[in-house]
Amino acid sequence: MQGKGVRIIFQPVLQTSFTIGSIETFTESAKRNNQKAKTKVIYFAELVVDKRIAAKTGFNIGDEIYYLQRLHYLDGKAIILNHNYFLKSVAKDLTIEIAEKSIYDYLENTLGVSIVTSKRIMTVEKMTEIDEKYLDLGDYNCMAVVTSHTYNSDGVMFEYTQSRHRPDYFSFQDNATRRSI
């Protein structure tokens, strides 16, 4: 019998969905979802990692980093607040202007950094004062939070990011495969 055992399992990716199994920039995701992206830097600082930051991020005490707070808009709505920490030795000469365009584009295409892998944890957390200040949360009192440790081809963790998403715009899509034991 022709075609026996073949099923089409493709489902189109939902609007405003982000992928789990790949590293995709905010701009790339917006483009894939046919939405207009904008990023605004609301805080930018150069810091030296202390004990508190090391415990939170995994960077070494004494590392020089950039710390940014970036607000991501989709179709004019503020939906994601990112707390980004970048190792200065990798993200050399990072500026607000670059951060409002695409940090990954700058790293890959200007600095030649090969971004290889990201370890992510997804949680739901109570909103903070800064979430409430910058994101129109309506009746929501919590945020979907994606925490990432991202590594380059030398195995160096160059980025720690906490990405805080409005719950009504949070959708991550993945395809899972069962492995035999």
What would you call each of these model-derived segments?
Residues 1-61, 91-96, 100-101, 108-116, ...:
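HTH-adjacent hinge/linker in prokaryotic transcriptional regulators
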Residues 27-28, 72-74:
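Short, charged beta->alpha transition segments
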Residues 35, 81-89:
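Acidic/polar active-site rim loop that often engages polyanionic ligands
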Residues 44-46, 71, 149:
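Residue-level recognition of beta-strand microenvironments
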Residues 58-61, 74-77, 89-90, 96-97, ...:
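C-terminal regulatory/effector modules of DNA-binding transcriptional regulators
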Residues 64-67:
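A short beta-strand signature within small-molecule sensing/ligand-binding domains used
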